[in-house]
């Protein structure tokens, strides 16, 4: 083979397949891979929006940590206050429920807080309130009153504890009672005769009952707070339902003297019958006198009490009317001044 042919790679007729050529092996050079650090050589330019977001994120993280610390401090203070409150409630319950032998409440470790100690000492040193003087009370009654005052103080201690005073709220609610009376369905007056004097001040129809409801106020005394609502029953229109709210602050009016009148009429009729009637013979003169004398006396007392109560209510109504009149004071001052001038001595 000619040398110029062997030098041409395209015209090489070398038949050594799979065997490395010496010239080719000598000419191969190892490749060196060079890793270039592009991040350090050429730093990336940050977007101003990204920088602003990173700053905002850092600020929010710092604020979140600060809020977490504040929340932990508040939770610790709340737990401390809750424990103190529970201790105070327990101590007040023990003092009010009969724990008077222990002068001051102690904590779990056995130590007494200074504020509670001072409070208990002041309560122990303070004398009980003196009993109200009573001119007709016996001397031995005076020794019982301090105990009653101590019991009242214990009740006040129980009421001022953490438990709600339900009894006070129940006493503030007006007393409600109902009365059922049979009445004629054709009677539309809605009047229930219960012995008191009432003044009607309103009437309306409710949703649950087609019959109207009437509203009354007690007019027997000016300051009586009792109200009455009268309405027919929705199930039976022959029944009137009277609902009373409150309690009367006066006595019940005396009933009419029908029994005394009936007894007097009966005695007159029995005296006027003929003597030959066997069943209606008149009794002895002394027996009717003994029977009717208490009734007459009782009727006189009731009439006197009724007239006294009517005069008292009339005086109260007149006083209220005069005090509400704005011109009453001016007229009273004028009358008094004129009377004083008339009675004053005049100098000659």
Swiss-Prot record:
**Motif position, Nuclear localization signal:** 116-122
Q: Which GO terms describe its cellular component?
A: nucleus
Keywords attached to this Swiss-Prot or TrEMBL record, sorted alphabetically, are: Coiled coil, DNA-binding, Gibberellin signaling pathway, Nucleus, Plant defense, Repressor, Transcription, Transcription regulation
Under InterPro entries, the record lists: WRKY_dom, WRKY_dom_sf, WRKY_plant
Tissue expression pattern: Highly expressed in aleurone cells. In seeds, predominantly present in the plumule, radicle and scutellum of the embryo. Expressed in roots, stems, young leaves and spikelets.
Q: Where in the cell is it found?
A: Nucleus
Report the coiled-coil segments: 50-84
State the phenotype upon gene disruption.
Impaired repression activity on gibberellic acid (GA)-induced promoters.
* Ranges that cross the membrane: none
> Pfam families annotated for this entry?
WRKY
GO biological process annotations for this chain's record?
A: defense response to fungus; gibberellic acid mediated signaling pathway; negative regulation of DNA-templated transcription; negative regulation of gibberellic acid mediated signaling pathway; regulation of defense response; response to abscisic acid; response to bacterium; response to chitin
Q: Report residue spans for region: Disordered.
A: 91-141, 246-287
Q: Where is the composition biased (Low complexity)?
A: 102-114
Q: Where is this region: Transcription repression of gibberellic acid (GA)-induced promoters?
A: 267-348
- Biased composition of type Pro residues is found at 126-136, 275-286
Query: Which conditions up-regulate this protein?
Result: Induced by biotic elicitors (e.g. fungal chitin oligosaccharide and fungal cerebroside elicitors) and pathogen infection (e.g. the compatible pathogenic fungus M.grisea race 007, M. grisea crabgrass BR29). Accumulates in response to M.oryzae. Triggered by defense signaling molecules, such as salicylic acid (SA), methyl jasmonate (MeJA), 1-aminocyclo-propane-1-carboxylic acid (ACC), wounding and pathogen infection (e.g. X.oryzae). Repressed by gibberellic acid (GA) (at protein level). Induced by abscisic acid (ABA) in aleurone cells, roots and leaves.
Relate the assembly described in the record.
Answer: Interacts with WRKY51; this interaction promotes W box binding of the complex WRKY51/WRKY71 in a zinc ion-dependent manner.
Its UniProt domain note says: The WRKY domain (213-266) is required to bind DNA.
Q: Which family does it belong to?
A: Belongs to the WRKY group II-a family.
Q: What does this protein do?
A: Transcription repressor. Interacts specifically with the W box (5'-(T)TGAC[CT]-3'), a frequently occurring elicitor-responsive cis-acting element. Represses specifically gibberellic acid (GA)-induced promoters in aleurone cells, probably by interfering with GAM1. Regulates, probably indirectly, the activation of defense-related genes such as GF14E during defense response. Modulates plant innate immunity against X.oryzae pv. oryzae (Xoo). Confers resistance to the virulent bacterial pathogen Xoo 13751, probably via the regulation of NPR1 and PR1b defense signaling pathways.
Q: Know the name of this protein?
A: WRKY transcription factor WRKY71
What does the organism's lineage look like at the top? Eukaryota, Viridiplantae, Streptophyta, Embryophyta, Tracheophyta
């Amino acid at each position: 083979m000619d040398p110029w042919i062997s030098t041409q790679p395209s015209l090489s007729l070398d038949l050594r397949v799979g065997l490395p050529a010496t010239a080719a092996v000598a000419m191969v050079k190892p490749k060196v891979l060079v890793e270039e650090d592009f991040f350090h050589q050429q730093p990336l330019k940050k977007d101003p929006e990204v920088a602003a977001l990173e700053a905002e994120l850092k600020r929010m993280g710092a604020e979140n940590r600060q809020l977490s610390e504040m929340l932990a401090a508040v939770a610790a203070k709340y737990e401390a206050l809750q424990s103190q409150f529970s201790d105070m409630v327990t101590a007040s319950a023990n003092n009010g429920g009969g724990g008077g032998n222990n002068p001051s409440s102690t904590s779990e470790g056995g130590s007494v807080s200074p504020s509670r100690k001072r409070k208990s000492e002041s309560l122990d040193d303070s004398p009980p309130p003196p009993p109200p003087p009573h001119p007709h009370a016996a001397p031995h009654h005076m020794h019982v009153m301090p105990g009653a005052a101590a019991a009242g103080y214990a009740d006040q201690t129980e009421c001022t504890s953490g438990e709600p005073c339900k009894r006070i709220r129940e006493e503030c609610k007006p007393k409600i009672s109902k009365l059922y009376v049979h009445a004629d369905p054709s009677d539309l007056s809605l009047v229930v005769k219960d012995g008191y004097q009432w003044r009607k001040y309103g009437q309306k129809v409710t949703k649950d009952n087609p019959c109207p409801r009437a509203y009354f106020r007690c007019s027997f005394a000016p300051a009586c707070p009792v109200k009455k609502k009268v309405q027919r029953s929705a199930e039976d229109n022959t029944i009137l339902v009277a609902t009373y709210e409150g309690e009367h602050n006066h006595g019940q009016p005396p009933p009419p003297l029908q029994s005394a009148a009936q007894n007097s009429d009966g005695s007159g009729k029995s005296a006027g019958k003929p003597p030959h009637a066997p069943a209606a013979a008149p009794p002895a003169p002394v027996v009717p006198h003994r029977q009717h004398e208490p009734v007459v006396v009782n009727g006189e007392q009731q009439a006197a009490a009724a007239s006294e109560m009517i005069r008292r209510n009339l005086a109260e109504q007149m006083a209220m009317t005069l005090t509400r009149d704005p011109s009453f004071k001016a007229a009273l001052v004028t009358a008094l001044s004129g009377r004083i001038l008339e009675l004053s001595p005049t100098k000659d």
